Protein backbone atom coordinates (compact mmCIF):
# COMPACT_ATOMS: atom_id res chain seq x y z
CA UNK A 1 0.00 0.00 0.00
CA UNK A 2 2.84 2.40 0.75
CA UNK A 3 4.04 4.36 -2.25
CA UNK A 4 1.12 3.36 -4.46
CA UNK A 5 -2.38 4.84 -4.26
CA UNK A 6 -3.31 7.06 -1.32
CA UNK A 7 -5.19 5.31 1.47
CA UNK A 8 -8.62 6.59 2.54
CA UNK A 9 -9.87 6.02 6.07
CA UNK A 10 -13.23 7.16 7.46
CA UNK A 11 -14.03 7.11 11.16
CA UNK A 12 -17.62 5.97 11.63
CA UNK A 13 -19.57 4.24 14.36
CA UNK A 14 -22.78 2.53 13.23
CA UNK A 15 -24.22 0.00 10.80
CA UNK A 16 -26.03 2.39 8.46
CA UNK A 17 -23.12 4.78 8.03
CA UNK A 18 -20.65 1.91 7.63
CA UNK A 19 -22.71 0.60 4.73
CA UNK A 20 -22.58 4.04 3.08
CA UNK A 21 -18.83 4.43 3.73
CA UNK A 22 -17.87 0.99 2.45
CA UNK A 23 -15.97 2.49 -0.50
CA UNK A 24 -13.19 3.69 1.82
CA UNK A 25 -10.11 1.49 2.22
CA UNK A 26 -10.59 1.35 5.98
CA UNK A 27 -13.32 2.18 8.46
CA UNK A 28 -11.89 3.31 11.78
CA UNK A 29 -14.14 2.76 14.77
CA UNK A 30 -12.55 5.53 16.78
CA UNK A 31 -12.99 6.25 20.46
CA UNK A 32 -14.09 9.65 19.17
CA UNK A 33 -17.49 7.92 19.17
CA UNK A 34 -17.61 8.85 22.82
CA UNK A 35 -17.77 12.52 21.91
CA UNK A 36 -19.72 12.61 18.65
CA UNK A 37 -22.21 9.82 19.44
CA UNK A 38 -22.37 9.52 23.24
CA UNK A 39 -21.81 13.19 24.09
CA UNK A 40 -18.81 12.75 26.38
CA UNK A 41 -16.51 15.75 26.78
CA UNK A 42 -13.43 13.67 25.94
CA UNK A 43 -12.46 10.22 24.71
CA UNK A 44 -11.11 9.10 28.08
CA UNK A 45 -14.55 8.04 29.36
CA UNK A 46 -15.13 5.51 26.59
CA UNK A 47 -15.25 1.88 27.77
CA UNK A 48 -14.32 -1.42 26.14
CA UNK A 49 -17.97 -2.48 26.18
CA UNK A 50 -18.90 0.64 24.23
CA UNK A 51 -16.09 0.14 21.72
CA UNK A 52 -17.15 -3.46 21.16
CA UNK A 53 -20.72 -2.30 20.55
CA UNK A 54 -19.65 0.30 17.97
CA UNK A 55 -17.17 -2.08 16.33
CA UNK A 56 -19.78 -4.78 15.92
CA UNK A 57 -22.22 -2.36 14.32
CA UNK A 58 -19.64 -1.10 11.82
CA UNK A 59 -18.43 -4.59 10.95
CA UNK A 60 -21.98 -5.66 10.12
CA UNK A 61 -22.43 -2.68 7.82
CA UNK A 62 -19.29 -3.09 5.72
CA UNK A 63 -18.68 -5.53 2.91
CA UNK A 64 -15.21 -4.69 1.63
CA UNK A 65 -13.57 -2.07 3.87
CA UNK A 66 -11.09 -3.11 6.53
CA UNK A 67 -12.42 -2.38 10.03
CA UNK A 68 -9.97 -1.03 12.63
CA UNK A 69 -11.18 -0.77 16.22
CA UNK A 70 -9.74 1.72 18.72
CA UNK A 71 -8.48 0.46 22.06
CA UNK A 72 -9.87 2.99 24.56
CA UNK A 73 -8.03 4.71 27.39
CA UNK A 74 -6.54 2.32 29.98
CA UNK A 75 -7.46 -0.80 28.02
CA UNK A 76 -3.83 -1.47 27.08
CA UNK A 77 -1.55 0.76 29.17
CA UNK A 78 -1.34 -1.31 32.35
CA UNK A 79 0.21 -4.42 30.85
CA UNK A 80 0.67 -6.34 27.62
CA UNK A 81 -1.80 -8.98 28.80
CA UNK A 82 -4.52 -6.31 28.96
CA UNK A 83 -3.63 -5.15 25.46
CA UNK A 84 -3.88 -8.68 24.06
CA UNK A 85 -7.09 -9.51 25.92
CA UNK A 86 -8.89 -6.32 24.92
CA UNK A 87 -7.65 -6.51 21.33
CA UNK A 88 -9.16 -9.97 21.22
CA UNK A 89 -12.48 -8.55 22.38
CA UNK A 90 -12.50 -6.06 19.51
CA UNK A 91 -11.65 -8.78 17.00
CA UNK A 92 -14.46 -10.97 18.33
CA UNK A 93 -16.76 -7.96 17.93
CA UNK A 94 -15.80 -7.73 14.25
CA UNK A 95 -12.57 -5.73 13.93
CA UNK A 96 -9.90 -6.81 11.45
CA UNK A 97 -7.25 -4.82 13.34
CA UNK A 98 -6.88 -2.58 16.38
CA UNK A 99 -5.37 0.87 16.95
CA UNK A 100 -3.63 2.19 20.04
CA UNK A 101 -2.01 5.49 20.92
CA UNK A 102 1.65 6.04 21.75
CA UNK A 103 5.16 5.57 20.41
CA UNK A 104 8.08 3.65 21.85
CA UNK A 105 6.31 3.48 25.21
CA UNK A 106 3.68 1.10 23.81
CA UNK A 107 6.02 -0.93 21.60
CA UNK A 108 5.82 -3.93 23.93
CA UNK A 109 2.02 -3.86 23.77
CA UNK A 110 2.14 -3.68 19.97
CA UNK A 111 4.60 -6.56 19.90
CA UNK A 112 2.40 -8.64 22.16
CA UNK A 113 -0.80 -8.01 20.23
CA UNK A 114 0.77 -8.66 16.84
CA UNK A 115 2.41 -11.75 18.30
CA UNK A 116 -1.08 -12.96 19.18
CA UNK A 117 -2.00 -12.66 15.51
CA UNK A 118 -3.90 -9.37 15.63
CA UNK A 119 -2.81 -6.57 13.26
CA UNK A 120 -2.06 -3.25 15.00
CA UNK A 121 -2.23 0.32 13.72
CA UNK A 122 -0.09 2.78 15.67
CA UNK A 123 -0.95 6.40 16.50
CA UNK A 124 1.57 9.16 17.27
CA UNK A 125 1.62 12.94 17.27
CA UNK A 126 -1.32 14.37 19.18
CA UNK A 127 -2.66 11.64 21.46
CA UNK A 128 -6.24 12.57 22.44
CA UNK A 129 -6.41 10.05 25.29
CA UNK A 130 -3.55 11.77 27.13
CA UNK A 131 -3.56 15.24 25.57
CA UNK A 132 -4.34 16.89 28.90
CA UNK A 133 -1.05 15.55 30.28
CA UNK A 134 1.00 17.02 27.43
CA UNK A 135 -0.30 20.55 27.20
CA UNK A 136 -3.64 20.03 25.48
CA UNK A 137 -4.57 19.86 21.81
CA UNK A 138 -1.45 21.33 20.20
CA UNK A 139 0.29 20.70 16.91
CA UNK A 140 3.17 18.27 17.34
CA UNK A 141 6.56 18.19 15.60
CA UNK A 142 7.06 21.92 15.24
CA UNK A 143 10.71 21.77 16.30
CA UNK A 144 13.52 19.70 14.83
CA UNK A 145 13.96 17.87 18.12
CA UNK A 146 10.30 16.93 18.46
CA UNK A 147 10.13 15.87 14.80
CA UNK A 148 13.06 13.51 15.32
CA UNK A 149 11.37 12.06 18.40
CA UNK A 150 8.29 11.35 16.31
CA UNK A 151 10.44 9.55 13.75
CA UNK A 152 11.96 7.45 16.54
CA UNK A 153 8.50 6.58 17.82
CA UNK A 154 7.35 5.64 14.33
CA UNK A 155 10.35 3.36 13.84
CA UNK A 156 9.74 1.73 17.22
CA UNK A 157 6.14 0.99 16.24
CA UNK A 158 7.21 -0.38 12.88
CA UNK A 159 9.82 -2.62 14.49
CA UNK A 160 7.20 -3.84 16.98
CA UNK A 161 4.99 -4.96 14.08
CA UNK A 162 2.54 -2.12 13.40
CA UNK A 163 1.17 -2.32 9.85
CA UNK A 164 0.36 1.42 9.66
CA UNK A 165 0.71 4.54 11.80
CA UNK A 166 -1.70 7.44 12.28
CA UNK A 167 -0.02 10.87 12.49
CA UNK A 168 -2.36 13.32 14.21
CA UNK A 169 -1.85 17.09 14.11
CA UNK A 170 1.81 16.85 13.14
CA UNK A 171 3.49 19.75 11.31
CA UNK A 172 3.48 18.90 7.60
CA UNK A 173 7.26 18.95 7.20
CA UNK A 174 7.71 16.62 10.17
CA UNK A 175 4.96 14.30 8.95
CA UNK A 176 6.58 14.09 5.53
CA UNK A 177 9.93 13.22 7.15
CA UNK A 178 8.36 10.58 9.39
CA UNK A 179 6.56 9.08 6.40
CA UNK A 180 9.84 8.72 4.53
CA UNK A 181 11.58 7.22 7.55
CA UNK A 182 9.35 4.15 7.87
CA UNK A 183 8.37 1.35 5.53
CA UNK A 184 4.75 1.14 6.66
CA UNK A 185 1.99 3.54 5.55
CA UNK A 186 1.28 6.69 7.52
CA UNK A 187 -2.30 7.91 7.82
CA UNK A 188 -2.56 11.63 8.42
CA UNK A 189 -5.20 13.59 10.24
CA UNK A 190 -4.28 17.25 10.34
CA UNK A 191 -0.74 16.36 9.26
CA UNK A 192 -0.55 17.64 5.70
CA UNK A 193 -0.51 16.02 2.28
CA UNK A 194 2.76 14.11 2.62
CA UNK A 195 1.30 11.10 4.41
CA UNK A 196 0.45 7.86 2.65
CA UNK A 197 -3.23 8.28 3.44
CA UNK A 198 -5.78 10.45 5.22
CA UNK A 199 -8.45 9.86 7.84
CA UNK A 200 -11.38 12.07 8.77
CA UNK A 201 -14.27 11.63 11.18
CA UNK A 202 -17.50 11.16 9.23
CA UNK A 203 -19.38 13.58 11.48
CA UNK A 204 -16.81 16.27 10.64
CA UNK A 205 -17.06 15.51 6.92
CA UNK A 206 -20.84 15.91 7.09
CA UNK A 207 -20.98 18.88 9.47
CA UNK A 208 -22.90 16.87 12.06
CA UNK A 209 -20.85 17.63 15.18
CA UNK A 210 -21.69 21.03 16.57
CA UNK A 211 -19.40 21.47 19.57
CA UNK A 212 -16.38 22.42 17.48
CA UNK A 213 -14.97 21.96 14.00
CA UNK A 214 -11.26 21.05 13.74
CA UNK A 215 -9.20 23.23 11.42
CA UNK A 216 -7.94 20.15 9.59
CA UNK A 217 -11.42 18.82 8.82
CA UNK A 218 -13.12 19.59 5.52
CA UNK A 219 -16.91 19.62 5.35
CA UNK A 220 -17.84 17.78 2.15
CA UNK A 221 -21.59 18.02 2.76
CA UNK A 222 -23.03 20.24 5.52
CA UNK A 223 -25.99 18.13 6.58
CA UNK A 224 -26.74 19.62 9.99
CA UNK A 225 -29.10 22.19 8.48
CA UNK A 226 -30.80 19.57 6.32
CA UNK A 227 -31.38 17.27 9.28
CA UNK A 228 -32.83 20.09 11.38
CA UNK A 229 -34.98 21.16 8.42
CA UNK A 230 -36.30 17.64 7.92
CA UNK A 231 -37.31 17.36 11.58
CA UNK A 232 -38.97 20.79 11.45
CA UNK A 233 -40.86 19.74 8.32
CA UNK A 234 -42.03 16.53 9.97
CA UNK A 235 -43.21 18.43 13.06
CA UNK A 236 -45.11 20.96 10.96
CA UNK A 237 -46.88 18.30 8.89
CA UNK A 238 -47.89 16.28 11.95
CA UNK A 239 -49.29 19.36 13.68
CA UNK A 240 -51.24 20.36 10.55
CA UNK A 241 -52.46 16.79 9.91
CA UNK A 242 -50.63 16.63 6.58
CA UNK A 243 -48.77 13.53 7.73
CA UNK A 244 -49.42 10.68 7.48
CA UNK A 245 -51.13 10.73 4.10
CA UNK A 246 -53.06 7.86 2.50
CA UNK A 247 -49.93 6.55 0.82
CA UNK A 248 -48.30 6.28 4.26
CA UNK A 249 -51.19 4.36 5.85
CA UNK A 250 -52.67 0.84 5.88
CA UNK A 251 -56.35 -0.09 5.49
CA UNK A 252 -58.69 -2.93 6.36
CA UNK A 253 -60.11 -5.22 3.72
CA UNK A 254 -63.23 -4.01 1.93
CA UNK A 255 -66.30 -4.12 4.17
CA UNK A 256 -64.40 -5.01 7.33
CA UNK A 257 -64.57 -1.48 8.71
CA UNK A 258 -68.35 -1.17 8.34
CA UNK A 259 -69.89 -0.05 11.61
CA UNK A 260 -66.62 0.46 13.48
CA UNK A 261 -67.13 4.23 13.76
CA UNK A 262 -70.56 4.00 15.41
UniProtKB/Swiss-Prot annotation:
Cofactor binding notes: Binds 1 Mg(2+) ion per subunit.
Residues involved in Mg(2+) binding: 31, 70, 101
UniProt keyword list: Coenzyme A biosynthesis, Cytoplasm, Magnesium, Metal-binding, Transferase
Pathway(s) annotated for this protein in UniProt: Cofactor biosynthesis; coenzyme A biosynthesis
GO-annotated molecular function: 3-methyl-2-oxobutanoate hydroxymethyltransferase activity; magnesium ion binding
Top-level taxon of the source organism: Archaea
Subunit structure: Homodecamer; pentamer of dimers.
HAMAP family named in the record: PanB
Protein's UniProt name: 3-methyl-2-oxobutanoate hydroxymethyltransferase
Source species of the chain: Cenarchaeum symbiosum (strain A)
Amino acid sequence: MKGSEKITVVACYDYSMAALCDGADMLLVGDSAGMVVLGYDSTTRVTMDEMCLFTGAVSRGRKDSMVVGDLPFMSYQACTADAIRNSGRLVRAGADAVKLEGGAAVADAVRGVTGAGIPVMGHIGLLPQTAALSGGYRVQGRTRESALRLAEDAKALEEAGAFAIVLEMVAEEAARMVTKSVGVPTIGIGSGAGCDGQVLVLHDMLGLYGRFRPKFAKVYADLSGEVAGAVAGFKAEVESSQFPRPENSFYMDAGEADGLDR
